[in-house]
């Protein structure tokens, strides 16, 4: 434990908070360009083909982002909006693509949780 004199000289050092989404540089979302769209397998015990994309953000950083929902229209050179949010069973995937924004279409025939997937309200 420091003495009072040591505290007068140096003071206490603030703890540095570590961000979970460093590539966003403090922004809620960032725009980026898809450099590669592919599928990958989750870690044990899950089994699937998860849709992900390599995205070069306008901050200059390249990240791996998850494409949520059923089906998508993304390909190389698509402009996407990326938000934070990890995918627990995909190591290294700490970002998600926002559905219904920029070049990304919303999920078709979505009835519940529509705002998360950029789906418009159906008529009738």
UniProtKB/Swiss-Prot annotation:
Bilayer-crossing residues are none
Q: Which residues carry this modification: 3-methylthioaspartic acid?
A: 89
Give any Gene Ontology cellular component.
small ribosomal subunit
Write out the biased-composition intervals (Basic and acidic residues).
Answer: 11-20
Q: Which NCBIfam families match?
A: rpsL_bact
Identify its protein family: Belongs to the universal ribosomal protein uS12 family.
Under HAMAP family, the record lists: Ribosomal_uS12_B
Describe the function of this protein. Answer: With S4 and S5 plays an important role in translational accuracy. Interacts with and stabilizes bases of the 16S rRNA that are involved in tRNA selection in the A site and with the mRNA backbone. Located at the interface of the 30S and 50S subunits, it traverses the body of the 30S subunit contacting proteins on the other side and probably holding the rRNA structure together. The combined cluster of proteins S8, S12 and S17 appears to hold together the shoulder and platform of the 30S subunit.
* Name listed for the protein in its UniProt record: Small ribosomal subunit protein uS12
Source taxonomy: Bacteria, Bacillati, Actinomycetota, Actinomycetes, Frankiales
Chain's gene name: rpsL
